[in-house]
Amino acid sequence: MCLTHFKLWKNFFELFRKGKDYTTSPSFWFRKGNNVIKNSNLPLMTAKDMDNLPPLLYQDDELIYQRSGIKPLNTKDFIKYTGLSYHTVWSIGCPLHCTYCGNTKFIEYDNAYRRIRHSSPQTIVEEIKRAISKQPHLSTVAFHDDSFLSLPYAQLEEFAKLYKAEIKIP
């Protein structure tokens, strides 16, 4: 079980690739026999951390995992898996504690997960523009945030202005 986002994977994969004990990886839990190893959490990402994440990769010849293994992504595969929409996440974290939601477990483990973290409006708009330039058939953008409408109003307002000016799809 992985309990935080993004930056911890580098450490995990380096240990795994070198054949070292990856069960010491921060922010992961592992089952060994009847025991559960609960490693401490890395700090949650900040807005600056999120602004510095590399963009999602959605262009021809980038790699995608399919049941048959890893293969180069092409436009046909992209449309097969995503349709005509670009799927992304701008923010993570949620102030709510809904019984049906998986975030509840994250909050129980670390109450700081309630705090919404997000990159800047400029960063998410640049990400969308890059995706559209790589996949010009895109006709919509779908956000899969934990709590999109809980973002600060000023950030949503700035995003709306940038989106309207620079993105030509709904």
Where are these regions (language model features)?
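Conserved residues at the C-terminal ends of beta-strands
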Residues: 2-4, 31, 56, 104, ...
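Glycine-rich beta-alpha loop elements in corrinoid/cobalamin-binding modules
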Residues: 1-47
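A generic structural signal for well-ordered coil/turn residues at beta-strand boundaries
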Residues: 24, 49, 82-84
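Conserved ATP/PPi-binding loop(s) of AMP-dependent carboxylate-activating enzymes
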Residues: 44-66
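Radical SAM [4Fe-4S] cluster-binding motif and immediate context
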Residues: 59-170
